C-alpha cells in the first residue's frame, strides 16, 4: 500500500488543529521556613497582600508580608503537616467566609466551618473577610435604640443601632454577662446576634452556647469561636470573619448585634504574628499598625442610609484591663475608636453591685439620640444624682452631722444604686424599666427600706401586669410616659395594698 505524503501531512495538521492543551498554569513557591503558625516561601513574586495560598497538604495560608526575597504567610489552621521544601501555590483569591441565613444557630470556627457537630452548613454565599467600611454618605446618624434590658445601661449609657460601645474592665467583672444579657434581650426584636469568642477556653464558650440555647437565643445567634488552644492566625482573623457574616445581613436591610469577646486577646495574637514575621515592634512590643487592626474592624459597624436599605451593625467590643488601668495602650486605642465605653469596676462587683457599671467613667457619645422619650424623662438626672451621691458618700465617712437635704440625697442615692442592680440573665423590657425609674425619681421609694427595693420592684411589675397593663402598653407604643397623674395613682394604689406602705 502506497503511503501518500499529502495525506500524512493533512492528518498531522488536523491533529495539531484539534489539539486541546490540558494543563493548569499556577504560580508556585517553595516553603523555606515553617513554625508557630508562620511560613515563609520563595518564588511567589506576584502574590497579593491578603491572598489565599494553598499548601501541598491542602492547608491554607494568607500572604501577609510581601518582601523582596520571600513572602511571609500566616497559616489558617493546623500547620503540623507542612514541611520545609513543600510546594505552596497561589489561588488568586482573597480569603472569604460562608455567610447567610444558614449560619444562624450554628457554632463555627473563623473559617466558617461548623464545630458544633450538627453537620454541614448549606450555603453557597461567601463574603471577603476584609472589605472597606461604608463611606460617610452611605451612613445615617444613629437614632433607633438597642435595648440591652439592663437598667444601668439603658438609663445611663444608652446604645443605638449602628453604634460601637466598648465594654471595658478587669477579668471577672461581668463583661461577658452584660453582652449575653443584651443578646437575650433581642428576642422578638428582629435582630440577628453574632458572638465572637477570641482566645476563650472551650469550656467557657460551651457554657455561653448552652446559656443562649436555654433561653432560646440561639435561634437568632451565630457563635464564632477561636479558642485559646488554636493557632494565633485564627484568633487574629476571627473578628473579621464575624463582621463579614454580619455585613451580609446589614446590606440586606437587617439589624445585627456583634460582640467581640475580647479584642485584647486579638491584639496579643496579632503582636505574636507580627514579631514572628519580623515586623518592627513599637510600644509594648505591639506593631505600628495595631490601631489600624481595630479601627478597620470597628468602622465596619454602621447604620446604613435608607438608599442602602437602612440596615445596621451594632458592635460591643471588649477590652480586658489590668488592675482597672483604662489608660493602657490598647484600651486608649479602642476608647478613641468607639462611640463610648461602659467601664466595669472590680470593687463594685465585689460589693454586690451587679452589673458593676461605674457611672462616672462610662459614657455613650451618640446613644442619647436613640433613647426613647419616656426613658429620657425618667433618667435625665440619674447620672448627676449618682455622681453627687458618690461624692457625698465619701464625704460622710468623716462625720455624721448631716442636714436634712444631705440625708435625703444620701437616701435617694442608696435606693438608686439598689434599683440599678439586676439578676443575671433577667433582662427587663423597657416599659418595666421606665416604671421603676419613675417610681424612684418621683420619691415613691424614699420610704421603702433599701433591703426591700428588689422585692418591691418584682411585686410592682406583677401588680402592673395584673391591673395596669394599659400603662405598659402606652409606653411600648407611644415611647412616651402616660399621664403623670395616672402613673402616680397606679404606683400609689400598689403601695397602699402592699406591705411596702
From Swiss-Prot:
It comes from the Bacteria. The keyword Signal does not apply. SUPFAM superfamilies: C-terminal domain of alpha and beta subunits of F1 ATP synthase (SSF47917), N-terminal domain of alpha and beta subunits of F1 ATP synthase (SSF50615), P-loop containing nucleoside triphosphate hydrolases (SSF52540). It is found in: Cell membrane. GO terms for molecular function: ADP binding; ATP binding; proton-transporting ATP synthase activity, rotational mechanism. ATP binds at residues 169-176. InterPro entries: ATP_synth_asu-like_sf (IPR023366), ATP_synth_asu_C (IPR000793), ATP_synth_asu_C_sf (IPR038376), ATP_synth_F1_a_nt-bd_dom (IPR033732), ATP_synth_F1_asu (IPR005294), ATPase_F1/V1/A1_a/bsu_N (IPR004100), ATPase_F1/V1/A1_a/bsu_N_sf (IPR036121), ATPase_F1/V1/A1_a/bsu_nucl-bd (IPR000194). It is a peripheral membrane protein. One of its GO terms (cellular component) is proton-transporting ATP synthase complex. Its EC number is 7.1.2.2. It catalyses: ATP + H2O + 4 H(+)(in) = ADP + phosphate + 5 H(+)(out). Pfam families: ATP-synt_ab, ATP-synt_ab_C, ATP-synt_ab_N. Its main location: membrane. Keywords: ATP synthesis, ATP-binding, Cell membrane, CF(1), Hydrogen ion transport, Ion transport, Membrane, Nucleotide-binding, Translocase, Transport. The record marks 362 as: Required for activity. Produces ATP from ADP in the presence of a proton gradient across the membrane. The alpha chain is a regulatory subunit. Belongs to the ATPase alpha/beta chains family. F-type ATPases have 2 components, CF(1) - the catalytic core - and CF(0) - the membrane proton channel. CF(1) has five subunits: alpha(3), beta(3), gamma(1), delta(1), epsilon(1). CF(0) has three main subunits: a(1), b(2) and c(9-12). The alpha and beta chains form an alternating ring which encloses part of the gamma chain. CF(1) is attached to CF(0) by a central stalk formed by the gamma and epsilon chains, while a peripheral stalk is formed by the delta and b chains. This is ATP synthase subunit alpha.
Amino acid at each position: 500500500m502506497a503511503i501518500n505524503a499529502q495525506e500524512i501531512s493533512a492528518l498531522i495538521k488536523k491533529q495539531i488543529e484539534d489539539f486541546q492543551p490540558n494543563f493548569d498554569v499556577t504560580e508556585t513557591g517553595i516553603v523555606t521556613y515553617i513554625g508557630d503558625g508562620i511560613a515563609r516561601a520563595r518564588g511567589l513574586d506576584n502574590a497579593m497582600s491578603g491572598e489565599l495560598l494553598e499548601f501541598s497538604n491542602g492547608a491554607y495560608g494568607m500572604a501577609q508580608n510581601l518582601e523582596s526575597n520571600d513572602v511571609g504567610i500566616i497559616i489558617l489552621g493546623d500547620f503540623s503537616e507542612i514541611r520545609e521544601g513543600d510546594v505552596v501555590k497561589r489561588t488568586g483569591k482573597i480569603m472569604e467566609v460562608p455567610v447567610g441565613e444558614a449560619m444562624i444557630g450554628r457554632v463555627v470556627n473563623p473559617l466558617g466551618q461548623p464545630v458544633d457537630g450538627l453537620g454541614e452548613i448549606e450555603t453557597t454565599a461567601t463574603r471577603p473577610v476584609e472589605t472597606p467600611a461604608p463611606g460617610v454618605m452611605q451612613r445615617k446618624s444613629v437614632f433607633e435604640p438597642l435595648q440591652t434590658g439592663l437598667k444601668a445601661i439603658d438609663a445611663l449609657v444608652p446604645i443605638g443601632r449602628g453604634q460601637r460601645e466598648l465594654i471595658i474592665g478587669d477579668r471577672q467583672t461581668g463583661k461577658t454577662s452584660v453582652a449575653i444579657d443584651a443578646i437575650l434581650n433581642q428576642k422578638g426584636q428582629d435582630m440577628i446576634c453574632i458572638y465572637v469568642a477570641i482566645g476563650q477556653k472551650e469550656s467557657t464558650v460551651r457554657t455561653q452556647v448552652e446559656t443562649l440555647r436555654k433561653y432560646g437565643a440561639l435561634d437568632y445567634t451565630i457563635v464564632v469561636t477561636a479558642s485559646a488552644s488554636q493557632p494565633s492566625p485564627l484568633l487574629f482573623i476571627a473578628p473579621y470573619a464575624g463582621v463579614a457574616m454580619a455585613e451580609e445581613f446589614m446590606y440586606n436591610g437587617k439589624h445585627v448585634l456583634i460582640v467581640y469577646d475580647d479584642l485584647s486577646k486579638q491584639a496579643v495574637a496579632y503582636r505574636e504574628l507580627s514579631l514572628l514575621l519580623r515586623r518592627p515592634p513599637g510600644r509594648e512590643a505591639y506593631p505600628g499598625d495595631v490601631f489600624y487592626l481595630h479601627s478597620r474592624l470597628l468602622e465596619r459597624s454602621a447604620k446604613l442610609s435608607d438608599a442602602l436599605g437602612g440596615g445596621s451593625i451594632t458592635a460591643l467590643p471588649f477590652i480586658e484591663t489590668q488592675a482597672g488601668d483604662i489608660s493602657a495602650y490598647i484600651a486608649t486605642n479602642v476608647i478613641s475608636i468607639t462611640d463610648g465605653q461602659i467601664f466595669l469596676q472590680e470593687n463594685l462587683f465585689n460589693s454586690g453591685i451587679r452589673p458593676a457599671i461605674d457611672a462616672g467613667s462610662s459614657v455613650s457619645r451618640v446613644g442619647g439620640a436613640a433613647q426613647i422619650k419616656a426613658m429620657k424623662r425618667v433618667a435625665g438626672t440619674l447620672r448627676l444624682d449618682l455622681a453627687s451621691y458618690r461624692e457625698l458618700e465619701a464625704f460622710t465617712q468623716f462625720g455624721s452631722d448631716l442636714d436634712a437635704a444631705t440625708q435625703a440625697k444620701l437616701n435617694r442615692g442608696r435606693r438608686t444604686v439598689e434599683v440599678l442592680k439586676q439578676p443575671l440573665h433577667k433582662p427587663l423590657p423597657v416599659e418595666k424599666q421606665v416604671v421603676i425609674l419613675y417610681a424612684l425619681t418621683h420619691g415613691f421609694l424614699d420610704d421603702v427600706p433599701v433591703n426591700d427595693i428588689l422585692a418591691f420592684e418584682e411585686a410592682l411589675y406583677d401588680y402592673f401586669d395584673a391591673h395596669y397593663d394599659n400603662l405598659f402598653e402606652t409606653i411600648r407604643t407611644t415611647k412616651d410616659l402616660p399621664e403623670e397623674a395616672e402613673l402616680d395613682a397606679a404606683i400609689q394604689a400598689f403601695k397602699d395594698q402592699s406591705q411596702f406602705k
